């Protein structure tokens, strides 16, 4: 929304009272910066001083979707930069708020210079070491909306006169140790940018006016996609943990050292995996607050036959308040990344450094297509000081494959590979996984008590049915409840989480038709070996079987297989296991990630105002579980929680 919208600027009081600010002009902002000298917060088109007084920069003066702010190169006390997602660059006077366009937004028809950078969908921006660094993470083409592996995105720098491409691939955050304030010593403090390509995450470091690159593993592939829409805004931010910053990237919480520089590259480590899609976060009082993108209106490009007609009519995003201790206790750490992918590599070429420290259960897969055996030297930087030493040498058979694991006493911060001779078709893929201490699916955890189980007998207290959040700011959810004996009618879940029956045959009929659970015919089959999923292109994928009871429909009939509950990816519930399923434009089912295995008879699920809502409840088994919302007439109920509660169901298992 480059000209503003009906969206609001909100203020939340310490007592969690939500206030709509009258200065609201909407738009699609992702920028925030505190200007030290004037003690003002620049967030979106708003400028807020220490007394809470809000001033507004109209979109007529600063056209575009604001994505990032940065300290000025020559007048940091008096001006700041602001950039849009479509490559506009503006100067803002911090006192008068006068705006000077330096480069026009790509959607702006006003005459003026354009940056004309490669890529699309701007993200982070930061200044230091005599330059302004800007990142985008997409490509604006029909091909980019289909193929996640084309050239896309850019990391670029501007010296006050000219733009220069640093690296032609997808980048998001750009920041430094100064964080939201900007670097205290801009001439010497480092800058960091996080991005990715088809092989891995890419961390770029600007230190001593030179760029250096490092590779990290991906936990999730649902963030891939050449158009750049699937990431939202990964960040590296301070959360009150001293010199440890928090980085969010590709479904993993990362510990990121505030002193990361060329002289000290140690300290980066994964903390846990997550399913939410996070746009920003901060520490507030005793909680971390994550701004999340849950189900998107109409699902954008995330369509597939397995879902049927079930797109949310209105976005359901919200804030997620989390105890900081939980950062280390969500999903288990998982990582996959490559340094080469089917590439011809000259003898003596050193790969990018790949993260080696802070990971467990590490392994390396090597493939090449050369006619002779290939010797690869493995080298490590043991302390992150840039001093490399031999670890060992691996020899791949002619036109062959080699797997090797790493022992716990094979230590180092980074690892790199060096071929002894010219290599053809060389692939080097690293994997790692944390210790998954969750129990295998068995007794249902108390948090999920009351959700019907495959082991439950016939029960008159069992109910379920299709659910769907409503549109036009009604801020409620409709539920077509039924038991094994027939329909209970329509129920409404309010924004205060009360569930009440409603007499409205027309709405009930509409819901049962338009949120119907689609047939699994041609999508899911089973044989003696496994479960078989067939995607929209006819490709077949095999999944492990869970409890044999899932071979049959449940007591209440069909059960939801697939639905978007976090933006631009799906939650896939098949044969007793939840999976994170990337959109088709992020390579779809070939990049699926298992989450947890359960023995639950879940009829339907969706996101509602940031919550995960589940139908398929047996009130007789709910006890005092506060996650169960009981209807006012006592006949039915729904389970509510966060999507990341699902990790607690147990480790993925099957046969």
Go through each PLM region and give its residues.
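Surface-exposed loop/turn elements that mediate protein-protein interactions on large endomembrane-trafficking
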Residues: 6-23, 46-64, 88-111, 142-174, ...
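Repeated scaffold domains used in trafficking and secretory/extracellular systems
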Residues: 26-38, 62-77, 107-130, 167-190, ...
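Entry beta-strands of beta-propeller and related beta-repeat scaffolds
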Residues: 39-42, 77-81, 128-135, 140-141, ...
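Blade-level signature of beta-propeller repeat domains, shared across WD40, Kelch, NHL, RCC1
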Residues: 276-344, 355, 603-655
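Asparagine-centered strand-capping/turn motif at beta-strand->loop junctions
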Residues: 366-370, 419
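Exposed aromatic-hydrophobic patches
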Residues: 401-408
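Noncatalytic modules at the cell exterior or secretory-pathway interfaces
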Residues: 408-425
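Exposed low-complexity, polar/acidic, P/S/T/G-rich flexible segments that act as propeptides
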Residues: 421-454
């Amino acid at each position: 929304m480059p000209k503003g919208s009906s969206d609001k600027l909100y203020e939340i009081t310490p007592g969690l009272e939500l206030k709509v600010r009258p200065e609201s002009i909407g738009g699609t902002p992702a920028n925030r910066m505190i200007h030290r000298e004037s003690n003002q917060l620049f967030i979106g088109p708003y400028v807020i001083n220490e007394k809470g007084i809000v001033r507004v920069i109209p979109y007529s003066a600063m056209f575009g979707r604001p994505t990032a702010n940065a300290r000025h190169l020559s007048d940091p006390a008096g001006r700041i930069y602001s950039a849009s997602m479509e490559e506009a660059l503006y100067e803002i006077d911090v006192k008068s708020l006068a705006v000077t366009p330096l480069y026009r937004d790509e959607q702006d028809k006003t005459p003026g210079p354009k940056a004309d950078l490669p890529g699309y969908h701007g993200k982070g921006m930061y200044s230091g070491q005599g330059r302004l660094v800007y990142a985008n993470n997409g490509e604006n083409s029909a091909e980019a909306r289909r193929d996640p592996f084309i050239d896309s995105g850019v990391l670029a720098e501007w010296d006050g006169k000219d733009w220069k491409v640093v690296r032609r691939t997808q980048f998001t955050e750009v920041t430094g140790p100064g964080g939201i304030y900007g670097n205290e010593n801009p001439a010497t403090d480092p800058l960091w940018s996080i991005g990715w390509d088809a092989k891995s995450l890419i961390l770029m470091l600007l230190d001593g006016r030179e760029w250096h690159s490092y590779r990290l593993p991906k936990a999730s592939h649902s963030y891939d996609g050449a158009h750049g829409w699937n990431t939202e805004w990964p960040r590296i931010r301070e959360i009150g943990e001293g010199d440890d910053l928090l980085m969010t990237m590709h479904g993993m919480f990362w510990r990121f050292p505030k002193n990361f520089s060329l002289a000290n590259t140690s300290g980066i480590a994964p903390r846990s995996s997550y399913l939410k899609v996070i746009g920003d976060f901060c520490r507030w009082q005793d909680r971390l607050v994550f701004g999340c993108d849950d189900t998107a209106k109409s699902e954008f490009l995330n369509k597939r036959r397995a879902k049927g007609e079930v797109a949310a009519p209105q976005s359901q995003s919200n804030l997620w308040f989390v105890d900081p201790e939980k950062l280390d206790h969500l999903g288990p750490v998982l990582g996959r990344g490559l340094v080469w992918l089917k590439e011809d590599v000259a003898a003596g070429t050193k790969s990018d450094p790949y993260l080696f420290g802070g990971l467990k259960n590490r392994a390396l897969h090597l493939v090449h297509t050369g006619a002779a055996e290939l010797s690869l030297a493995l080298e490590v930087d043991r302390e992150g000081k840039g001093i490399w030493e031999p670890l060992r040498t691996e020899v791949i058979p002619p036109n062959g494959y080699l797997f090797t694991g790493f022992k716990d006493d094979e230590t180092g911060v980074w690892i790199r590979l060096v071929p002894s001779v010219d290599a053809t078709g060389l692939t080097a893929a690293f994997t790692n996984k944390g210790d998954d201490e969750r129990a295998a699916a068995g007794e249902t955890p108390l948090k999920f008590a009351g959700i019907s189980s495959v082991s439950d007998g016939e029960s008159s207290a069992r109910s379920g049915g299709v659910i769907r959040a409503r549109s036009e700011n009604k801020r409620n959810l409709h539920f077509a409840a039924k038991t094994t004996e027939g329909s209970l009618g329509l129920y409404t879940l309010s924004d205060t989480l009360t569930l009440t029956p409603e007499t409205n045959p027309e709405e009930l009929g509409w819901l049962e038709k338009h949120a119907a659970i689609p047939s699994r015919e041609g999508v899911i089959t089973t044989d003696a070996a496994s479960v078989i999923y067939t995607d929209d292109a006819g490709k077949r994928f095999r999944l492990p079987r869970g409890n044999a009871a899932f071979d049959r429909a449940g007591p209440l009939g069909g059960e939801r297989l697939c639905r978007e509950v976090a933006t631009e990816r799906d939650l896939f519930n098949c044969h007793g296991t939840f999976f994170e399923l990337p959109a088709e434009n992020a390579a779809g089912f070939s990049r699926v990630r298992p989450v947890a295995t359960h023995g639950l008879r879940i009829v339907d699920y969706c996101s509602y105002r940031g919550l995960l809502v589940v139908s398929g409840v047996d009130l007789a088994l709910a006890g005092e579980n506060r996650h169960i919302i009981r209807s006012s007439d006592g006949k039915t109920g729904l389970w509510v929680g966060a999507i990341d509660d699902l990790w607690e169901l147990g480790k993925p298992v099957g046969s």
